Amino acid sequence: MSEFSQTVPELVAWARKNDFSISLPVDRLSFLLAVATLNGERLDGEMSEGELVDAFRHVSDAFEQTSETIGVRANNAINDMVRQRLLNRFTSEQAEGNAIYRLTPLGIGITDYYIRQREFSTLRLSMQLSIVAGELKRAADAAEEGGDEFHWHRNVYAPLKYSVAEIFDSIDLTQRLMDEQQQQVKDDIAQLLNKDWRAAISSCELLLSETSGTLRELQDTLEAAGDKLQANLLRIQDATMTHDDLHFVDRLVFDLQSKLDRIISWGQQSIDLWIGYDRHVHKFIRTAIDMDKNRVFAQRLRQSVQTYFDEPWALTYANADRLLDMRDEEMVLRDEEVTGELPEDLEYEEFNEIREQLAAIIEEQLAVYKTRQVPLDLGLVVREYLSQYPRARHFDVARIVIDQAVRLGVAQADFTGLPAKWQPINDYGAKVQAHVIDKY
């Protein structure tokens, strides 16, 4: 997030000195949200004490609280929010008793978290990324032009620090809010499945698909602009390499690169985690259906029998011929009728016979390594054999070669516990992982 210039002890001492504290029970938080909502409808952003009392009255009615002490409780709530720096109070000698109230940055931040930031908008994210791209391009152009220290502060450092970094923080906040929404969706799905999983399947599917779509939309938007943003950051970084006095710009660019990498990386990781959860839910539903279908059928049958006299029913069944009534014996009996007698050159040779012949040949050829005590590199040997056979036979031939090779001896490197390197054995992507056999 944003960079802090103070140390932890300084911040702790500062908070203790100013007696900062926030206490917002659900009714007070609702009051603050009501104030923020009504305040957003006003052009001047100001509210009188009477308007605050009216807002408190709506909240009090919603919580079914007594109306006899509305004035006192509203006054206490307003004073408490002023004390907690959620509201600013402005009084005037000309209008004594008619104070004006405005939300503080803290109050706006809290209400934004609960109201405005909850809504994900691809258009908003696209606009933010468009603004960032424009700012980065102008900063990169200014960096390549070069200039004095004022030029670097004004045209490079300032846009990066006060525009690009803040928008990156806003995007990061959006991702963190999406994390909370995912957790809320998981809780909703758990509650639905615990109540009645059969009725909840459609609702679960809707929640899963909506969340997956939102995450994918967010990530696609980020990835589409990510390369261009990184390219402009690299341009600025290249321009600062020849200046020893621009460490502050170089450090800021490095921080922005780290933020952008973290944002894009977490977006993809969040999608992967959600896909795993999606599969877990579907597996649970399938398991529940498999376990429950027999019980449900028995229950419905029992209920139908019990209510037969009130709701009579008829059972109709059909005994159709089997569509797949074919057996190996029947095929063998009809084999001669279909194929007739074949010449000896076209007689079918079973694969087992071919395998035995091939294994004997390979065993005889590999025995040379044992006789001469020459190390046997499986990767090279298998590749040499596969080059002599068509692609369709590669798997079977490779298995035979490996089976015969491991009978000759072992690799001393196997006892080190270190994995062997993967070696390609054909031109189609097949690989083998094995140490060189050197002990027969």
Swiss-Prot record:
Location of the protein in the cell: Cytoplasm, Nucleoid
Q: Does the keyword Transport apply?
A: no
Return the annotated region ranges for Leucine-zipper.
208-236
This entry's Gene Ontology molecular function terms read: calcium ion binding
Which InterPro entries does the record match to this protein?
Chromosome_partition_MukF (IPR005582), MukF_C (IPR033441), MukF_C_sf (IPR038198), MukF_M (IPR033440), MukF_M_sp (IPR036141), MukF_WHTH (IPR033439), WH-like_DNA-bd_sf (IPR036388), WH_DNA-bd_sf (IPR036390)
Signal peptide span: none
Q: Which Gene3D superfamilies match?
A: Chromosome partition protein MukF, middle domain, MukF, C-terminal domain, Winged helix-like DNA-binding domain superfamily/Winged helix DNA-binding domain
Keyword line: Calcium, Cell cycle, Cell division, Chromosome partition, Cytoplasm, DNA condensation
What cellular-component terms does GO give this entry? cytoplasm; nucleoid
The UniProt record lists the keyword Acyltransferase: no
Q: Name one GO biological process term.
A: DNA replication
Q: How does it assemble?
A: Interacts, and probably forms a ternary complex, with MukE and MukB via its C-terminal region. The complex formation is stimulated by calcium or magnesium. It is required for an interaction between MukE and MukB.
Sequence similarity: Belongs to the MukF family.
**Role noted for this protein:** Involved in chromosome condensation, segregation and cell cycle progression. May participate in facilitating chromosome segregation by condensation DNA from both sides of a centrally located replisome during cell division. Not required for mini-F plasmid partitioning. Probably acts via its interaction with MukB and MukE. Overexpression results in anucleate cells. It has a calcium binding activity.
This one is known as Chromosome partition protein MukF
